[in-house]
Regions:
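ABC family nucleotide-binding domain
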Residues: 4-216, 220-225
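C-terminal boundary and immediately downstream tail of ABC-type ATPase nucleotide-binding domains
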Residues: 222, 226-248
Length: 248
């Protein structure tokens, strides 16, 4: 039995002035499904994620979340961000706040949850990712990998239905990439519904239920990880994947 559809995208388009960034994008995302989007820089991957959680308006088409159309702006953005969480490649932690203050700000001020319960949950989540000793640290005292894991917790503590990850390892040193990807992999095992933009091909293959290859604002090809990586049908997909291997 197929799981319920959480998100539907129907013929989505996005323009900036005369430039078309996304062209006729359609997909469905089911509960606990992990979709990984791959593709060259500038093909619309990040813009697509920003459309999903309302950071960018759409030029055409519909986005439907749990049966409710959200692409028309009818859902308040604060409410939408509680349902669809997002982690960016640039961390975006508040530099003047401690780790604990960064994590607990939104659930306390936006969701008006019980302070004691929120702090207890934050401590538990910090312990889970091995950063329980950093609750009183400031962002400047953390490594890039630690900042990114804190950014993930800050989004997850809002209890979103869907998580979006936009190239979360792009600005990290190679040694820090694994510690961040391990957290995402663990979320997948626990059934978190996710859409992930990534250039980490081995990770994409391991974590995804479905791979989408974006090119020039279109879904040029989609399929299971095995289908995309072992037997791509689109010549452009083959060319892109070949760029990740070096043959002398």
């Amino acid at each position: 039995m197929e799981k319920e559809i959480l998100l539907e995208v129907n013929h989505l388009s996005k323009k900036f002035g005369d430039q078309t960034i996304l062209k006729d994008i359609s997909l469905t995302l089911r509960k606990s499904e992990v979709i990984v989007i791959i593709g060259p820089s500038g093909c619309g991957k990040s813009t697509f994620l920003r459309c999903l959680n309302g950071l960018e308006s759409v030029s055409g088409g519909d986005i439907i979340l749990e049966g409710q159309k959200i692409s028309d702006g009818s859902m308040p953005h604060a409410e939408l961000c509680q349902k669809i969480g997002m982690v960016f490649q640039s961390y975006d932690l508040f530099p003047h706040m401690t780790v604990m203050e960064n994590i607990t700000l939104a659930p306390l001020q936006v969701q008006h949850r019980n302070k004691e319960e929120v702090f207890k949950e934050a401590i538990k989540m910090l312990s889970r990712i091995g950063l329980s000793d950093k609750e009183n640290a400031y962002p400047r005292e953390l490594s890039g990998g630690q900042k990114q894991r804190i950014a993930m917790i800050r989004a997850l503590i809002m209890k979103p239905d869907i998580m979006l990850f936009d190239e979360v390892t792009a600005s990290l040193d190679p040694e820090m990439v694994r510690e961040v990807l391990d957290v995402v992999m663990e979320l997948a095992k626990e059934g978190m519904t996710m859409v992930i933009v990534s250039h980490e091909m081995q990770f994409a293959r391991a974590v995804a239920d479905r791979i989408l290859f974006f090119d020039k604002g279109l879904i040029a090809e989609e399929g299971t990880p095995d289908a995309i990586f072992d037997n791509p049908q689109n010549p452009r997909t083959k060319q892109f994947l070949h760029s990740f291997t070096y043959e002398n």
